[in-house]
């Protein structure tokens, strides 16, 4: 998924669509909060994946000009 997300983020950066990037970031942060509270299964791999995706989105946001 990370490569797909990299391409999506790159597209939104190219379009200068800060709102879409913030929406993706919020979704991933919510997902991470849910994964951390999961019991009965080992969510470490999913947590690592979502954390990596958050880093990708944050990097994309950092490349946009400040508002």
Predicted segments, located by residue:
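N-terminal acidic leader/helix
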Residues: 1-37
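Short, charge-rich amphipathic interface segments used for partner binding and complex assembly
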Residues: 23-67
């Amino acid at each position: 998924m990370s490569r797909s997300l990299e391409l999506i983020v790159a597209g939104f950066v190219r379009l200068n669509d800060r709102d879409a990037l913030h929406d993706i970031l919020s979704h991933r942060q919510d997902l991470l909060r849910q994964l951390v509270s999961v019991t009965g299964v080992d969510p470490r791999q999913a947590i690592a994946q979502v954390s990596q995706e958050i880093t990708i989105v944050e990097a994309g946001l950092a490349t946009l000009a400040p508002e």
